[in-house]
Amino acid sequence: MRRLPPLLFLVMALVWETAVPLARAQAAGEVAAAPPIQEQLAKLEQQAAEARTAGDNAWLLVSSALVLMMTGPGLALFYGGLVRKKNVLATMMQSFTLIALITVLWALFGYSMAFGSGNLFVGGLDHLFLRGVGAQPDADYAATIPAQTFMVFQLMFAIITPALITGAFAERMKYSALVLFMTLWALIVYNPMAHM
Protein backbone atom coordinates (compact mmCIF):
# COMPACT_ATOMS: atom_id res chain seq x y z
CA MET A 1 0.00 0.00 0.00
CA ARG A 2 2.85 2.38 0.74
CA ARG A 3 4.15 2.09 -2.82
CA LEU A 4 0.81 2.81 -4.48
CA PRO A 5 0.89 6.67 -4.27
CA PRO A 6 4.40 6.99 -5.80
CA LEU A 7 3.49 4.46 -8.51
CA LEU A 8 0.24 6.29 -9.23
CA PHE A 9 2.14 9.57 -9.41
CA LEU A 10 4.62 8.03 -11.88
CA VAL A 11 1.82 6.76 -14.14
CA MET A 12 0.10 10.15 -14.11
CA ALA A 13 3.38 11.89 -14.98
CA LEU A 14 3.95 9.53 -17.94
CA VAL A 15 0.42 10.08 -19.22
CA TRP A 16 0.84 13.85 -18.87
CA GLU A 17 4.18 13.81 -20.73
CA THR A 18 2.80 11.84 -23.67
CA ALA A 19 -0.79 13.03 -23.89
CA VAL A 20 -0.27 16.79 -23.63
CA PRO A 21 2.26 17.13 -26.52
CA LEU A 22 0.12 14.80 -28.64
CA ALA A 23 -3.01 16.87 -27.96
CA ARG A 24 -1.16 20.11 -28.78
CA ALA A 25 0.21 18.65 -32.03
CA GLN A 26 -3.20 17.34 -32.99
CA ALA A 27 -4.77 20.72 -32.32
CA ALA A 28 -2.17 22.34 -34.52
CA GLY A 29 -2.77 19.79 -37.29
CA GLU A 30 0.77 18.41 -37.19
CA VAL A 31 -0.21 14.76 -36.72
CA ALA A 32 -0.14 12.86 -39.99
CA ALA A 33 -3.16 10.84 -40.91
CA ALA A 34 -2.84 7.09 -40.57
CA PRO A 35 -2.39 5.22 -43.86
CA PRO A 36 -5.49 3.53 -45.23
CA ILE A 37 -6.24 0.07 -43.92
CA GLN A 38 -5.65 -1.51 -47.35
CA GLU A 39 -2.06 -0.27 -47.39
CA GLN A 40 -1.47 -1.59 -43.90
CA LEU A 41 -2.94 -4.99 -44.82
CA ALA A 42 -0.84 -5.22 -47.99
CA LYS A 43 2.30 -4.40 -46.01
CA LEU A 44 1.46 -7.01 -43.36
CA GLU A 45 0.78 -9.66 -46.03
CA GLN A 46 4.14 -8.92 -47.65
CA GLN A 47 5.93 -9.21 -44.30
CA ALA A 48 4.14 -12.51 -43.58
CA ALA A 49 5.15 -13.90 -46.98
CA GLU A 50 8.79 -12.90 -46.40
CA ALA A 51 8.75 -14.52 -42.95
CA ARG A 52 7.24 -17.71 -44.37
CA THR A 53 9.89 -17.84 -47.09
CA ALA A 54 12.68 -17.30 -44.56
CA GLY A 55 11.26 -20.00 -42.31
CA ASP A 56 10.96 -22.50 -45.16
CA ASN A 57 14.50 -21.73 -46.25
CA ALA A 58 15.88 -22.14 -42.72
CA TRP A 59 14.01 -25.40 -42.22
CA LEU A 60 15.43 -26.94 -45.39
CA LEU A 61 18.97 -25.75 -44.68
CA VAL A 62 18.89 -27.22 -41.16
CA SER A 63 17.45 -30.45 -42.55
CA SER A 64 20.21 -30.54 -45.17
CA ALA A 65 22.87 -30.07 -42.51
CA LEU A 66 21.40 -32.91 -40.46
CA VAL A 67 21.40 -35.27 -43.44
CA LEU A 68 25.02 -34.32 -44.16
CA MET A 69 25.89 -35.14 -40.55
CA MET A 70 24.23 -38.52 -40.97
CA THR A 71 26.46 -39.23 -43.96
CA GLY A 72 29.80 -37.82 -42.86
CA PRO A 73 30.40 -38.75 -39.28
CA GLY A 74 27.27 -40.88 -38.85
CA LEU A 75 27.66 -43.55 -41.51
CA ALA A 76 31.44 -43.31 -41.52
CA LEU A 77 31.69 -44.12 -37.82
CA PHE A 78 28.94 -46.73 -38.03
CA TYR A 79 30.54 -48.62 -40.92
CA GLY A 80 33.98 -48.14 -39.36
CA GLY A 81 32.73 -49.91 -36.26
CA LEU A 82 31.41 -52.86 -38.25
CA VAL A 83 34.63 -53.83 -40.00
CA ARG A 84 37.91 -55.34 -38.88
CA LYS A 85 40.57 -53.12 -37.40
CA LYS A 86 42.73 -53.04 -40.54
CA ASN A 87 39.86 -51.74 -42.73
CA VAL A 88 38.42 -49.03 -40.47
CA LEU A 89 40.10 -46.07 -42.20
CA ALA A 90 39.35 -47.32 -45.71
CA THR A 91 35.71 -47.88 -44.85
CA MET A 92 35.36 -44.47 -43.21
CA MET A 93 37.12 -42.83 -46.14
CA GLN A 94 34.52 -44.27 -48.52
CA SER A 95 31.77 -42.19 -46.90
CA PHE A 96 33.78 -38.99 -47.02
CA THR A 97 34.93 -39.60 -50.60
CA LEU A 98 31.33 -40.10 -51.68
CA ILE A 99 30.42 -36.71 -50.21
CA ALA A 100 32.97 -35.02 -52.49
CA LEU A 101 32.34 -37.22 -55.54
CA ILE A 102 28.56 -36.93 -55.57
CA THR A 103 28.72 -33.19 -54.85
CA VAL A 104 30.88 -32.63 -57.94
CA LEU A 105 28.71 -34.90 -60.11
CA TRP A 106 25.54 -33.21 -58.83
CA ALA A 107 26.88 -29.73 -59.54
CA LEU A 108 28.14 -30.63 -63.02
CA PHE A 109 25.13 -32.44 -64.44
CA GLY A 110 23.34 -34.54 -61.79
CA TYR A 111 20.90 -31.82 -60.76
CA SER A 112 20.11 -31.13 -64.40
CA MET A 113 19.53 -34.83 -65.07
CA ALA A 114 17.23 -35.13 -62.07
CA PHE A 115 15.30 -31.85 -62.21
CA GLY A 116 15.73 -30.48 -65.71
CA SER A 117 12.91 -30.53 -68.22
CA GLY A 118 13.57 -33.48 -70.47
CA ASN A 119 11.83 -36.69 -71.36
CA LEU A 120 10.13 -39.17 -69.04
CA PHE A 121 13.34 -40.85 -67.87
CA VAL A 122 16.01 -38.17 -67.66
CA GLY A 123 16.05 -34.39 -67.44
CA GLY A 124 17.55 -32.11 -70.03
CA LEU A 125 20.53 -29.83 -69.86
CA ASP A 126 18.60 -26.87 -68.42
CA HIS A 127 20.67 -26.72 -65.23
CA LEU A 128 24.00 -27.98 -66.55
CA PHE A 129 26.76 -26.69 -64.23
CA LEU A 130 23.91 -25.32 -62.04
CA ARG A 131 22.99 -22.75 -64.68
CA GLY A 132 19.85 -20.89 -63.66
CA VAL A 133 19.90 -22.21 -60.09
CA GLY A 134 19.81 -19.04 -58.04
CA ALA A 135 18.15 -17.36 -55.11
CA GLN A 136 14.78 -17.09 -56.84
CA PRO A 137 12.21 -19.80 -56.03
CA ASP A 138 11.22 -22.24 -58.75
CA ALA A 139 7.44 -22.59 -58.73
CA ASP A 140 7.69 -26.08 -60.26
CA TYR A 141 9.28 -27.48 -57.10
CA ALA A 142 8.59 -25.10 -54.21
CA ALA A 143 7.12 -21.62 -54.43
CA THR A 144 8.71 -20.29 -51.23
CA ILE A 145 12.13 -21.95 -51.30
CA PRO A 146 15.11 -20.58 -53.27
CA ALA A 147 16.30 -22.89 -56.02
CA GLN A 148 19.77 -23.08 -54.43
CA THR A 149 18.31 -24.32 -51.15
CA PHE A 150 16.23 -26.92 -52.98
CA MET A 151 19.33 -28.03 -54.89
CA VAL A 152 21.36 -28.43 -51.68
CA PHE A 153 18.53 -30.34 -49.98
CA GLN A 154 18.28 -32.76 -52.89
CA LEU A 155 22.08 -33.04 -53.02
CA MET A 156 22.16 -34.34 -49.46
CA PHE A 157 19.92 -37.24 -50.42
CA ALA A 158 21.94 -37.87 -53.56
CA ILE A 159 24.96 -38.19 -51.25
CA ILE A 160 23.48 -40.39 -48.54
CA THR A 161 21.88 -42.89 -50.93
CA PRO A 162 25.15 -44.30 -52.37
CA ALA A 163 26.80 -43.95 -48.96
CA LEU A 164 24.20 -46.35 -47.57
CA ILE A 165 25.07 -48.83 -50.31
CA THR A 166 28.75 -48.86 -49.35
CA GLY A 167 27.91 -50.76 -46.19
CA ALA A 168 26.91 -53.76 -48.30
CA PHE A 169 30.40 -54.22 -49.68
CA ALA A 170 32.59 -52.91 -46.88
CA GLU A 171 35.91 -54.83 -46.99
CA ARG A 172 34.84 -56.50 -50.26
CA MET A 173 35.62 -53.96 -52.98
CA LYS A 174 38.69 -52.04 -54.08
CA TYR A 175 38.61 -48.29 -53.56
CA SER A 176 38.97 -47.42 -57.26
CA ALA A 177 36.19 -49.86 -58.18
CA LEU A 178 33.96 -48.25 -55.54
CA VAL A 179 34.50 -44.78 -57.00
CA LEU A 180 33.75 -46.00 -60.53
CA PHE A 181 30.70 -47.98 -59.43
CA MET A 182 29.23 -45.09 -57.42
CA THR A 183 29.80 -42.65 -60.28
CA LEU A 184 27.96 -44.91 -62.69
CA TRP A 185 25.27 -45.71 -60.12
CA ALA A 186 24.59 -42.02 -59.48
CA LEU A 187 24.37 -41.23 -63.19
CA ILE A 188 22.49 -44.31 -64.40
CA VAL A 189 20.27 -45.15 -61.42
CA TYR A 190 19.82 -42.28 -58.95
CA ASN A 191 19.44 -39.28 -61.25
CA PRO A 192 16.86 -40.88 -63.58
CA MET A 193 14.91 -42.23 -60.60
CA ALA A 194 14.91 -38.79 -59.00
CA HIS A 195 13.62 -37.35 -62.28
CA MET A 196 10.75 -39.80 -62.56
Show the residue positions of the predicted features:
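Hydrophobic alpha-helical transmembrane bundles of multi-pass membrane proteins
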Residues: 2-8, 17-196
